[in-house]
Amino acid sequence: MDSNFLWPMLAMFLGSLVVMFGFLKKINEWYYVGRLGEKKNSLPPGEMGWPLLGNMLSLIKAFRSSDPDSFIHCLVDRYGRTGVYKSHLFWSPSIVVCTPETCKHVLMDNEKFGRGNPESTKELLGKQTVSLSTEEHKRLRKLTTNPFRGDKALTMYVGYIEDIVIDMLDELGSINKPVVFLFEMRKLAFKVIGHIVFGTTSDHLLELMEKYYTDLLLGLRSPAINIPGFAFHGALKARKLLVKLLEEVLEERKKRSGIEQKKGQKGMIDLLLEAEDENGKKLEDVHIIDLLIINLLAGHESSAHASMWAVLYLNQHPEMLQKAKQEQEEIIKRRPSTQKGLTLEEIKQMDYLAKVIDETMRRSSLFIPIFREAKVDANIQGYTVPKGWQVLVWTRGVHMDPEVYTNPKEFDPSRWDNHTTKPGSYIPFGGGPWICPGADLTKLEIYIFLHYFLLNYKLELQNPECPVAYLPVPRPSDNCLAKVIRVG
């Protein structure tokens, strides 16, 4: 073919590709922004990405790399440190907030920003309950929060958590072979939350539930594509099995509701069955089951990952490990000879361990943001947030911001010495009216686990140079394959 003809044709083809891709990149902008009229002029900076996908490919690419925070850094580098950006993420037009001020604004303003969840979350956690009115949600939240909060409730669980931790560590320290440490932490946390939800535990029941929850979690972090082979499809099947199992548990509890139970045997499920509104109306079973699913889910993920990362970070810093261990030894020395086991008062004396836990939760923040939705047209620092758009509170963006935390990639518990936390700068459990009700219980589990681990065990990693994977959650790519070795 004549080269004089070939080159112009190639140039036309490449030019057509550029025009086509440019057109595709503008579709989301035209569809979501163009319809806003004058309001579009006061939107925050940012771009809407590709049709349907939005900017999800850029987000996933960042979290599959060794620098997951590059996604937010790119926004800051490109548009300046506004703390608020427009985007299209998790299949919806979005406003990203990632500074303490903007995060606090969204989390605290319940009048303008309500709960917002991706469609996959609504389907898997229960549309009827996730979509309840604010007043109804407050009433149910009060019922489900009571078993988790306050010194009286926490004191009741110390001994139980202790027993589980001691038994689990004893078993792991005896088998003399590597275990998947993250999975063991999940089993521990699930057993604890299972006791609180059901009052008593059946190992078989909890093992079955944990299996279903593994599939459910994968679906929560995936697009809502209900086709065999996709994670969401498997998660829907797991939810059906979980609902069936919980229906059986509910029926069994109803049958024995007339039989007097010991106070220590009552769980959240019993409180929900007994609950009545001002008109004497009881909760429907569908709402009870959804609430149980939500609380079982929220109650075990955070503590499992934080416990694992605390051990890993301390392993990487022997001087910090020794300091944390010495603090636990001092607590034992001060203990009366007649006392057996930990008390809540002793846990409150673990000043250095508290800093280790806070730093662990900051450093190992999840990539999933906190989802909110604008109830009305709102304003954040002079920028318009259109009604119906989702607002993503980017906790990791705050926790890893060098202007908020010096050298944020370093694990440094001493940064919490005499530290005054600026509102919105430390939000591992969210904030405002929707703050995680199980935050105190999560920390209690971590304290008790680390107390016994530091005193009596060490971790021998099988792959010390194992890279970190950030999807779906930050973890060693081998899920922390290690031997638990008894040293005490």
UniProtKB/Swiss-Prot annotation:
PANTHER family: CYTOCHROME P450 26, CYTOCHROME P450 88D6. InterPro entries: Cyt_P450 (IPR001128), Cyt_P450_E_grp-I (IPR002401), Cyt_P450_sf (IPR036396). It comes from Citrus sinensis (Sweet orange). Its cofactor is heme. The chain crosses the membrane at residues 4-24. Monooxygenase involved in the biosynthesis of limonoids triterpene natural products such as limonin, a compound with insecticidal activity responsible for the bitter taste in citrus. Catalyzes the epoxidation of melianol to produce 7,8-epoxymelianol. Belongs to the cytochrome P450 family. The keyword Hydrolase does not apply. Its EC number is 1.14.14.-. Accumulates in mature fruits and in juice vesicles. It is a single-pass membrane protein. This is 7,8-epoxymelianol synthase CYP88A51. Pathway: Secondary metabolite biosynthesis; terpenoid biosynthesis. Keywords: Heme, Iron, Membrane, Metal-binding, Monooxygenase, Oxidoreductase, Transmembrane, Transmembrane helix. It is found in: Membrane. Its main location: membrane. Heme binds at residue 436. It catalyses: melianol + reduced [NADPH--hemoprotein reductase] + O2 = 7,8-epoxymelianol + oxidized [NADPH--hemoprotein reductase] + H2O + H(+). GO terms for cellular component: endoplasmic reticulum; membrane.
